[in-house]
Amino acid sequence: MFNLKIISLLFILLVTACSGENAEETINNTTNENDKGEITMSEDKVYAAMPEMTIDTGKKYTAKIETSMGEMKVEFFSDTAPVTVNNFISLSNDGYYDNIIFHRVISGFMIQGGDPSGTGHGEYGKYPGYTFNDELDSQQPYEKGILAMANAGPNTNGSQFFIMYVDYPLPYQYTIFGKVTEGLDVIDAIAGVQTAEGDRPVNDVTILGVTVSSD
C-alpha cells in the first residue's frame, strides 16, 4: 500500500509535456533577440535555448524567495547540480518567476511552482522553451525544505520545481539543487492553505520575486 502511495505521488510531480511540430512552432514564434543578438525572454516567458553557464561553481549561492505568504531563504547545491542551479539563477535574475503561483500544494508532501500558465502543464511543452538533463548525483534525501525539479520524465527539466514539505522516500528521479535554510514556517503556511481540484490553492499563493546572492 505504501509503494502504491509513492507511485501516485510520482505522477503528481510529472510535468505534462507536448512533443511535435506545433510545440516547436510556438516556441520559435514567441522568442526574440535583442539588438546585440542575445537570446532573450519573450513577453510570455519563452526562450529559444537554455541559459549559458554563468555561475562560478566555486562560489556559494543563495536566494531569497519572497512569496505572498512570507519569505524563504534557499542555499543552492552548485557542486552537485551546477546546470540546474545556473538555470534557476538565470531565470530568477531575468524575473521569470515573478508573479508565478504555487499551482500545486499537497499537505503531507510538497509545494510546486514555476509554471507561468499556473496549471502544471506548462502549456504542454511551451514553457520555458527548452529542456535539460537531470543531475542526480546528490546524496541528499528528499527531506523537508529540499528544492528539486519537477519533470515529465528523464532529462526533461525546465522551469518547474517543488519544495518538500515533509521527509519522503522518493526515488532519485528529480534533480535536487538546493534547500530552504530559513523560512520553513512559510512552507508550513503554504502547505496549510485550502486547495481545490488538482491540489491548486483556492486563493493564489504567489512568488513575488527571487533575489540571488553569492559569497
Predicted regions and their residues:
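Cyclophilin-like peptidyl-prolyl cis-trans isomerases
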Residues: 2, 18-215
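Sec-dependent bacterial lipoprotein signal peptides
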Residues: 1-16
